[in-house]
Amino acid sequence: MVFNSKKLKQGLLSLGHKVSEVMIHDHIEADTDSIRQDNTSKSSNTRKQRVNSMRTFVNRSFKKSTRTHAGTDTPMKPAEAPKPTSQSTQPTQPAKSTKSAQQPATLYRRVNLFRTFAHIFATKKDSSSQSSLQQAQESVFKQYIGWRSVTNPLWCLYGMRVSVIVLSIFGLFMVFSSSSVTMITYGVAPWGQGISQTLYCILGMMGYIFASRVPVAYYRRYVAIIYTVSAVAQFLTFVPGLRREVNGNAGWIAFGPITLQPAEITKLALCIWLPIGLLAAKRAYERVRMRAYIPVAVGLGISLLLVIAGKDLGTALIIILIALIAFYLGGFPTRWLITGMIVASIMVALLVLTSQNRMRRILATLHGCDAKAAKGVCFQAIHAQYAMASGGLLGVGIGNSREKWNYLPYAHNDFIFAIIGEEMGFLVASAVILLYIIIGWCILASALQTESKFISITLMCIATWIVGQGLVNIMVVVQLLPVMGVPMPFVSAGGSSLVMCLVAVGVADGLMRANPRLTAAK
């Protein structure tokens, strides 16, 4: 918006004159009342003489002020004093008028100060503020031109939003396509899973909008409640009657027809709780040394043990990855961080060695599948490769997959990327990977530009969760990693994963909009 500086200047000067005129008028009226009360015994001629002397003094003062501004602006016409009556022509008594003239003189100095401020503001402030704002906007614009535009906080915000929306909508179509045969097999309508996924997507979008509007201070205030809710929900997986086991994974709870996977809540809770706890421990490190990190270590250990006890090693690995990023960025001592990584590696190795199924999966990934394993532990991985190979460059067409006809188990869950490659081809599958990279880059760029350590670490944890889990799922499908049972964010069927992933990026959205550079880039 372009302002007319001349009109603004005249308007401010006129406003100053009006305000000063009202102030003087009120002052004269107040003085008139005091004269009327204090001098009730005096004649009316004396009172009128004092009032008229005050009006004359103010009138002369405004004429002097008008002559002062005549060189720069149009002279301002002060209010005309009332014509003196026949009684006002009498000479005034100096002794009586001195006290009355002191108050208008002081008032005139105050009014003149206001008029001077208005004049300076009209002539200088309007142009300087506009020029400084334009310079700031131009500097911000020049900062993000060319290849630097990929770090523009505004572009990153909308890039993340568009990528999440595209993945979520694309996931609805793929869930419907990949689950239709399975639904018919179980005697359910072919669109049953698709409708359920749509409802979860709407619920997740509502959670996204709500989370994006939460002020940053609320996370610090209610972080203990967030962590407690996640820990209690994870503990409910061991309560008889609520516990639900799916394919050996006991990390589910059921409330009637609704099932919930609390581990998804735990991921989001740790993304918020770990940065706050680590930053608080770092501030107390100088006083109590490593004892400051005991509460954080205990809280992380409780959540991790509850997930591992539910036999969900894939989710436990994602949590370990999130914790590793949080501890590294939170300033945890490097020596102890390396020690913790060694301990975590030993624990994972023990969990693998004590499970024959996990050990066979790892060996099949490293050494290939023999004829016996092809019908057992390698069955999913082999048919996933069949699906990817038959898709080619452009795919066989949406809905025309062959592997979804009960050849590839859980085609709409953990192996939905194989159906994407088969039906949509290599190009669309590559575009899906690109969308995850865009989400990760946008969150990473915003995390590096913010001045808040809490926001930076939280954004990095969320990016590690979303992008890391997505890449792990893809690497499992192409047999670069053993089967872990990790869903694909925003795409795989599953209400808990979809809702919590959308809420997580909603939290990231709100934290990204807290960046002051985002306002400057608009």
Explain the meaning of each model-derived region.
Residues L199-G204, I272, E422-I443:
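Hydrophobic alpha-helical transmembrane segments
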Residues L317, I322-W336, R402-V428, V486-V499:
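Interfacial segments of multi-pass membrane proteins
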Residues M206, A224-I225, R289-I308, L313-L353:
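Hydrophobic alpha-helical segments of polytopic membrane proteins
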Residues R243-W252, G256, W336-V432, E451-T458:
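Hydrophobic, glycine- and aromatic-enriched re-entrant/interface helices and adjoining loop segments
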Residues A79-A101:
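Compositionally biased, intrinsically disordered low-complexity segments enriched
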Residues A447-G485, V491:
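Loop-to-helix entry and N-terminal half of a specific, functionally important transmembrane alpha helix
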Residues R291-V296, I319, G340, T365, ...:
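Alpha-helical transmembrane segments of multi-pass membrane proteins, especially transporters
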Residues V2-K42, R47-R67, P104-L167, F173-K311, ...:
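Membrane-helix boundary/helix-loop-helix interface segments in multi-pass membrane proteins
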